[in-house]
UniProtKB/Swiss-Prot annotation:
<feature type="binding site">
    <location>
        <position position="200"/>
    </location>
    <ligand>
        <name>substrate</name>
    </ligand>
</feature>
<feature type="binding site">
    <location>
        <position position="89"/>
    </location>
    <ligand>
        <name>substrate</name>
    </ligand>
</feature>
<feature type="binding site">
    <location>
        <begin position="31"/>
        <end position="39"/>
    </location>
    <ligand>
        <name>ATP</name>
    </ligand>
</feature>
<dbReference type="GO" id="GO:0004138">
    <property type="term" value="F:deoxyguanosine kinase activity"/>
</dbReference>
<dbReference type="InterPro" id="IPR002624">
    <property type="entry name" value="DCK/DGK"/>
</dbReference>
<dbReference type="GO" id="GO:0004137">
    <property type="term" value="F:deoxycytidine kinase activity"/>
</dbReference>
<feature type="binding site">
    <location>
        <position position="131"/>
    </location>
    <ligand>
        <name>substrate</name>
    </ligand>
</feature>
<dbReference type="GO" id="GO:0019136">
    <property type="term" value="F:deoxynucleoside kinase activity"/>
</dbReference>
<dbReference type="Pfam" id="PF01712">
    <property type="entry name" value="dNK"/>
</dbReference>
<dbReference type="GO" id="GO:0005634">
    <property type="term" value="C:nucleus"/>
</dbReference>
<dbReference type="InterPro" id="IPR050566">
    <property type="entry name" value="Deoxyribonucleoside_kinase"/>
</dbReference>
<comment type="similarity">
    <text>Belongs to the DCK/DGK family.</text>
</comment>
<feature type="binding site">
    <location>
        <begin position="243"/>
        <end position="245"/>
    </location>
    <ligand>
        <name>ATP</name>
    </ligand>
</feature>
<keyword id="KW-0539">Nucleus</keyword>
<dbReference type="InterPro" id="IPR027417">
    <property type="entry name" value="P-loop_NTPase"/>
</dbReference>
<protein>
    <recommendedName>
        <fullName>Deoxycytidine kinase 2</fullName>
        <ecNumber>2.7.1.74</ecNumber>
        <ecNumber>2.7.1.76</ecNumber>
        <ecNumber>2.7.1.113</ecNumber>
    </recommendedName>
</protein>
<keyword id="KW-0808">Transferase</keyword>
Length: 265
């Protein structure tokens, strides 16, 4: 298994010195809806002071308010009374382009946030992102286009905007590796129904199957065409999480060990 590659430092970030940039590893955790990403990032956050987790900014896409500091500030859509995630599922043809554009923007903002002082002092600092700007495009936006919810003009504009935006911040948002939580669409549906988020009530199995296919061709079979050079050879760790691990200490230890090996081998 190859180690996560070091990113090319094309320019100094305002709050990072070159030594820290060379040490820092940025890893995205990818997977279908309800695959277990949130459960895993909570485990990672507790495991090491040298690991920092950036959760999916779902609170900025809907009317959910949590006690976490990064979720207290209302997004523009919330201030205007909007719940973009709910709007997407209710009227996907109307809101798909709007949602995917805002989702990508919110992820870029999350990845550009200043590094914590504690992580800056770490010998082997790692940032784990719950999904990435790449799955926004190659999984979710692509699926919405193929299902007819994003039209050809919107898709062309989205791809152009996405490529331009990522190229502007390439050195700051490039990933060093991807962890793919692999599970069946049927298992995801079970977990989705169990957690009972209001915005997800309309999700059906076919939608999860389509997202599963996208993840498989991109991260497992590696047959999907991608437009960013760093993605073509990026190290990928595939973890089978079809069996629930939320309350399974043995499975949790196994997953942590696999991730540690991925980071250091």
């Amino acid at each position: 298994m190859s180690a996560p590659a070091k990113r090319r430092c094309r320019g100094p970030a305002a709050d990072l010195d070159s030594s820290f940039q060379k040490r820092l590893r940025k890893i995205s955790i990818e997977g279908n809806i309800a695959a277990g990403k949130s459960t895993l990032v909570r485990l990672l956050e507790k495991h090491s002071d040298e690991w920092e987790v950036i959760p999916e900014p779902i609170a900025k896409w809907c009317n959910i308010q949590t006690s976490e500091d990064e979720c207290k500030e209302l997004s523009t859509s919330q201030k205007s009374g909007g719940n973009l995630l709910q709007m997407l599922y209710d009227k996907p043809t109307r809101w798909a382009y709007t949602f995917q554009t805002y989702a990508c923007l919110s992820r870029v903002r999350a990845q550009l946030k200043p590094i914590s002082a504690k992580l800056h002092e770490a010998e082997h600092p790692v940032q784990f992102f719950e999904r990435s700007v790449y799955s926004d495009r190659y999984v979710f936006a692509s699926n919405l286009f193929e299902s007819g919810n994003i039209n050809e003009t919107e898709w062309a504009i989205y791809q152009d905007w996405h490529s331009w935006l990522l190229n502007q911040f390439q050195s700051e948002i490039e990933l060093d590796g991807i962890i793919y939580l692999r599970t069946t669409p049927q298992k995801c549906m079970e977990r989705l129904q169990k957690r009972g988020r209001k915005e997800e009530e309309g999700i059906d199995l076919e939608y999860l199957e389509n997202l599963h296919y996208k993840h498989e061709t991109w991260l497992y079979e590696k047959t999907m065409r991608v437009d960013f050079e760093n993605l073509k050879e990026i190290p990928i760790l595939v973890l089978d999480v079809n069996e629930d691990f939320k309350n399974d200490k043995i499975k949790q230890e196994y997953l942590i060990d696999e991730i540690k090996s991925f980071l250091t081998s």
